[in-house]
Each structure stands twice: as C-alpha cells, then as structure tokens.
Amino acid sequence: MIMILMEWAYMATLSFLMGFACLAPFRKKGGCQIHSAVTYMMAGLLVLNVYAEYFSLFAGVGFWASLIAVFAAVIGGMLLRRDLADFFKISKIQACQKKTERSDEGIENSKSLWRKKNKAVWLLYAGLTLLFAYGSSRGYMHYDTGLYHAQAIRWIEEYGVVPGLANLHSRFGYNSASFALSAFFSETWLIGRPMHCVAGFFALLCACKCAAGLMAFWKRKKVRISDFLSIGGIFYLIAVFREMVSPASDYFAMLVLFWVIMTWVELWEQERDCPIGEKQTVPYALLSLYLVYAATVKLSTAVILLLVLYPAVLLLRQKKWLQIAGYIALGLLIAFPYLARNVLISGWLFYPFTFLDWFPVDWKISKGYADSDAKEIQAYAREIYNVYQLDQPLKQWLPNWFAAQAGFDKLLVLAGWAAIPVSAVLAVLGVVCAVRAGRAAVASHAGSAASAENGARAFRADRAAVAFRAGSAVSEREIGAPLPARRVAHLTPLCFSLLQLCAVVGFFFWQLGAPLVRYGYFYVLFLPLTVFGSLYCMAAEKLAGSEQGHNGRKWLKNAGYWAFVGLLVAFFTYKGYNLIQMVRELAYEPYYLWQQDYVDGSAEMYEVDGVTIYVPTDRGQIGYNKFPSSPIVQDIELRGNSIRDGFRKKPK
C-alpha cells in the first residue's frame, strides 16, 4: 500500500506535467481554460499511454521509456513555469509581476487550488487516496489477469511487440492499449518486481470527479443530470473496489467512459442556457479524442464515438477547417499505434473481427480461428457456453441469460429496457428544440443581414466591410455572442438528443452483442441514469417554479433538492455499508507495504526452436513470472533466429 502511494505520487506528477504541457496550445489559441488538476492528469495519462504504445513498436517499455518521458515532462514544466505558477499560485508576487504582460483575466481565473479548496475538501481527497490505495493493494485478481494480462504486460516491458504474438496465445490479439500504460508504470526495472496499480489510479481520479460533482450539487442547491451520473460512477467504483488490484482492460474502459461522459454532461449543462461559441467547441473536441482512446482500450466502447458528431457539427458550422483537420490528425495519432500493434500481433486490424482483411503477412491468425474466437466471446457473455449454439434466437437465449444474472443486475437491465421508449421521446424533443432554435437563429441572421445592407447603402465606399461590421454588431447586441457562436447556439439541444441516442445505441450494442455485465457496466448505468435523471430534473424545476419566484407552496420549491438529498443518504448508507464490509474482509491481508503480486501458477514446459515456453496446469493461470507462456502446446515456430522475430504457424 505504501509503495502504491509512492508510485501514485510519481504518476500524478508525471501525468499532470505531461497533460499541462500538451494542453497548452488549446489554452492559448483555443481559449480552453482548465482549472482541474484531475483533467490535466487524465490528459497526461492519455499522452503517456499513446507514447508507450509508440515506444513499444521499437523497443521494450522500461527504463529508457521512463527516462525520456520524465525528461520531456521536466522540460515542459520549465518552459511553462509561469503558467504553472498561475495555476497553483505558488507565489502571489510571481503571479502579479507579469501583470502587464499577461491578461488580468487569466490570472484571476487561475485561482490557487490551495485557497479554493478548504481543509475539509482536501481531507476528503486524502481519504479517497488512502481508500483506493488500500483497495488497489489487495483483493481479487481477475481470472484473465492470470490467464494473459500479466503476460501481455511483460511482453511489452521486455520486447515491446513481436510479430505473430497471437500465435503463441490468441488472447494477446485483443491488444488493449491499457497494457502499454501498465507496462510503463510497472517499474520492474527499478524495484525488481512488477507493480499493477494504474487501474486503481484511474479509479481514484474518477472518484475525485464524482466527489467534486456532488460537492457542486451541494453548493448550487439544484439537481442536474450530472449528479445522477456521479452516483452511477460511485456505484461502479464500489462494485469493482476489491478488483482494482487487477490491470483488467474492462475497468480502464469503463472508468474512462464514466469520466468522459460526466465531463461532457457538465459542459452541456453549463451551456444549455447560453450561446455556444468557439471556446466551448474545444472541450468537446478534446473529449472526443479521449473517446478515440477509450476505443483503443476496449474496442466495444467504440459505439460511444457517436458523440463525436456534436463537436464535428459545431466546427463545420463555424467553418473551422484547420481545426477539423487538426483534430482528425490527433485522432489518427492516437489510434495508429494501437492499429499497428494489432497488425503486428495478429495480422488483423481489429482482432478477432475479420471484416477487414488487408495484410497478407505470414504470421496472420487464420480467419476461421479468429471468427471462432469472436463467437466464443459472445457465447460466454450470453450464458450459452457452446459456440455451436450461438445462433439461438433472441427469445431463446435472452430469458436464460436474464435468469443467470444477479438480483441487482436484473433491476439495472430492466431499468435500461424501461428507459428506451422514454429516451426516444426525449431525443425527439431535443431535436425539435434544436430546429426551433435554428429557425430563430436564421430569422435573427436575416435581420442582421438587412441591417448590414442598410449600412452598406449609407457607406457605399466600402460595401463589404460595412456589411460585415453591421452584421456583427447586430448579432452581438441581440444575441450576446459573436457570429460563429450564433451559427451554433441553436445546436445545444442537439447535444442532449445525441447523448440519448448514444445511451440507447450503447445499451442495445451491449445487450444484443456480448451482454456480460463486466463488459458493459457503463452502458447498463448510463441509459437509465440519463433518462430518469432527466425526468427527475424536469420535475424538480417544475416544482421550483420560474426564476422570478415560486407561486405555489414554499415547501415545494426545494422538494426536488431535498428528495435527491434523501436519495443520496439512502444510497451512501447502503453502498457505504457494503464498502465497509469489503474493507474489513481485506484488512487481514499483509499488503500494507507492497502490493499483492500476480498469481504464480504451476506450469509445464516445452520448446519452440530452442525457446522454453510455459504451459499452465491450473485452469490456465500462469501469471507474470513464468515467461513466456501459451495456454496449450502450440504448433508454431520462430520466424527467424530469435524471439524478437516473432512466431508463426508451422507450415503443413
């Protein structure tokens, strides 16, 4: 546990500096002001993950990868030391010395975290850190971690990537991007044993995000949809608390989605009552990049990429062609190492899916084997357990699957199905609001154009310049936003409709594809929380009355707020009790200094062209130490003289 706290201090510092440096262009040119250290850390983790993937294409991710990253972070921190001083307000004098050179608004907005947060809040964050370090130090090691996660991470540490690795173990072909980040922070080269606490760090950042959201609710005295999502995030964190010790890609993917959607909804809530301008486009575009990253962590999250349509429409309406090209390039930059590793490991772009057969390499996994692997995933998730019965109709396998679920999971699934028709209605209402607002914007634009034409007649010397000035002046005076903002202001309701669409499509994708709750906890929670949370917020606002005052009974005005407080009390009482029980059960495990190790399963050995390969004898559990391993004795050979040349099937 103590070693985890030390590792997290290093991770927090490095990821914050990397995120702060990489977001600097968006702060200065895009006008995107970020005041959250957690946001910078999340951005930094994305950058470090992509960096580790690129590094793995050429070498093992170990000492040199860490040294280069630390050097880059230090250089970035030195170059941006004034911005860092403004952010933390280390010295008021240093922040004010450049007052003539830098905007007062920027200095004023970058208020010190140490002054902004009172002692109680910092104690809360410290308590969360200790709690999640405790949970990350011990618990249940996921079955797949002993099967292949630990081995995949060690391959990245020692070799980066070798061609045809999926011929040794087909599960390596799944190639989650999170394994590269786990390898980067494994620190085996430094302490002689692997650490696996990155999932716990993601969980901690997500917990801080949820806590900040609920504290904002307490201050504003008004219920928002993001508050329901915060509850959903906390529910998921408690559900996986005793499993965070495992570097499973499912946890990474779900935590990333929770963080992105909570941030996305908070942005939408802040802007739904005011025009959307250029500055508000940047955060959505940056969050879209994180959705691309989530798809590289777990391919099943790619359905949420539908949200990318919203910033795309905003940028297209504002005709920001250069920005559009830039964001597309950044998305490709994030996806490329993942795709390259896919091809090198299995020969397929999206293993185990074979719809894109573009690379005729000698290490490619056969199409039949890949298709069978994909069917096994679906069969297992549907509680079928026989891949030859996968073609069962929905009415046959769905009742059996539902009966096999845990009691509370059944309630969540039923809530999801019940939310679908309501979500459709809410999505249509959002589109209608967007269309109406669009017509109003067109009418306003026509009035601005007429005013511009009149001005042009008065000043014939420069018709084009006068028209531009007149149109801009009228639009700013009438709408309160510049012309680019006016072009997209009416699209705010469209964001809500798109959220509803993503919630429904994601739920259907999970339910009809591979409906294992572990694969899609986010989808199971996202749909009912957004739908019924929206209805609750509408009812609460109706009870509160108009902004000018409440004409009904006084106790009704805050009924929605206090009812939500009661819901929070009941939720934290129930889930808090469960959390305390888990903490007590794990208290006797001796992991207060070091973290619980990977499983070390028994194994037999065989050779492939002089290379010793381990085969687990205990239900596929092999762990980290016995390396390299395969689930069975494989009929493979080396592609060259060394293991770095990779593996391929023996020719028949």
Which ranges hold each PLM region?
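Active-site lumenal/periplasmic loops and adjacent helix-entry segments of GT-C-fold
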Residues: 131-226, 244-246
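Membrane-lumen/periplasm interface segments of specific transmembrane helices
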Residues: 137-140, 181, 325-405, 412, ...
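Perimembrane helix-loop-helix junctions
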Residues: 77, 101, 108-111, 304-332, ...
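Membrane-embedded, hydrophobic transmembrane alpha-helices
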Residues: 1-91
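Hydrophobic, aromatic-rich transmembrane alpha-helices
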Residues: 17, 21, 25, 202-217, ...
